[in-house]
Amino acid sequence: MDPESAAERGFNRADFDLGHKVVQIDGEHDLFGDASVVCLPTHGHTPGHQSLRVRLASGDVVLAADACYFCRTLRERRLPQRVYDRQAMLASLDKLARLEAAGARIFFGHDGEFWKSVPQAPAPIT
């Protein structure tokens, strides 16, 4: 999200701008050039929202964050009440469903039941 749009939505730049180099990206972005960590556009909840696909030896994991709060969000397409763009969020859910169908494990942003089923830090995700 560009700084002006962020400010319009109540984000305070001082909360996030720590002086680091920032690169705005459009579309997918391979962080290391080896497909091990890829930013995926999953717009809808907020403009510019991104999820991460992480390639592990055991298969791909997608950190969906706020693109998909709960497992039931993906299964039932039940969107939260506060959504920036409903159609974009539904398209992002379709993308996550395709990744899951291809074998990726989706990590849901706020699903307490899901988080009980995965290793907790500092244990590795395998």
Q: Which residue ranges define each predicted feature?
A:
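Metallo-beta-lactamase
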Residues: 1-40, 85-103
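Catalytic core of the metallo-beta-lactamase
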Residues: 17-71
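Cap/insert and terminal regions of metallo-dependent hydrolase folds
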Residues: 49-126
